[in-house]
Structures are given as C-alpha cells and as structure tokens.
C-alpha cells in the first residue's frame, strides 16, 4: 500500500513548478501558485484522519483517496487541454495534490495491528521503506522523451491510482475475514477454555486468538 499510494502526488509535487513554468507561468508565479495546495493538503489530512477515528472505518474511508484522484488523473491524462490550457492544467494538478492523504491512517494501522513493541517497530520500518521505494519509483515516471505533455507518464499515474481500489478493498476483506474466523473459534470456547488459553498460550501480539485487527 505504501509503495503505490503516494506515487501520483509525489510525481506531481516534484514537477509542479517545472510544469507551471513550462505552460507559461513565471518562476515567481509558479512559486506562489504552489502555496494553496499545501494549505488544503494539511486541512484534508487532519479532517480525514479525525474522521477515520470517529467512524472506526480506516480502510473504508481510505477509499476516498482513489475515488478522488482517479477522475482527476483521467482528466489530466485524456483531456486535450492538458499542458495547453494553463489555468485548467493548474487547477487539475492542484486538486490532485489536495487528495485525501492516507499516510497517517496507514501508519496507525501498522502500529495498532502489530500490538507488540517488537513487531510494531519492524512493521513501521517496513512500511516506511516501501514509502521511500515509492519515492524512488515516482522520480522515474516522467521522462524527457515524454515531455512536454507527459501523456505516457500521466497514464502510468492513472493506472497506479486505479490499482489502489483492489489493494484497499482486499486489505479490508482480509482483516474482516480473519476477525470473523477468530470470533468463531473464540465464541465456541467455554469460559474455562478461554481462561486456560489466556493463561497458557504462547501466542503473542496480533497472533493471539483474542486479538482483533483494526481496519
């Protein structure tokens, strides 16, 4: 999830001022036009993260990210005015950069579903490694041969955004399935069997039968 989720926004954020200058804005204008998306990005980050805690549906609300970005990336890729209509191009890119940012949600899921300190450290590090790998990938999507329209690169971004649907939905279904299976086994036990399990089990952290995954 961390590998692919942020590639479209990372690419556009990296090339924002370059793209704005290439479509007719001055350097000063490009720097000023980059400010609004930072403000909206912060507001949406807090809003989405708060909502997931309130609704207790983290992966469900995380679907807002591809639902939001896929149509905009489709416009960026297939609209004939992309890179020609400067204000239209700027508006689309800014809206994409203001997408619901799910990084905080993913980190919290790694932490909560790890349960033990040892596992939490490993899972969080692995997640961050995948995020960094995504940054490396994003730096190689826009190529000189694809400039100045970046049709091929924008097509890749569109495909990656689409791929987030099965990733998020699949993750949700897996966690729900595991929790249901554990509920069946746990509820089938008598109180004595539960007490015996809790006092004798060698299972730790998220492997425990009485642990339920957050999703």
UniProtKB/Swiss-Prot annotation:
Topology in the lipid bilayer: Multi-pass membrane protein
GO biological process, one term: transmembrane transport
GO molecular function terms attached to this record: transmembrane transporter activity
GO-annotated cellular components: endoplasmic reticulum; membrane
InterPro entries to which the protein is assigned, alphabetical: MFS_trans_sf
Cellular location(s): Membrane
Keyword Metal-binding: no
Sequence intervals crossing the membrane: 3-23, 30-50, 59-79, 87-107, 122-142, 156-176
Keywords: Membrane, Transmembrane, Transmembrane helix, Transport
Family (UniProt): Belongs to the major facilitator superfamily. Allantoate permease family.
Protein name: Putative uncharacterized transporter YOL162W
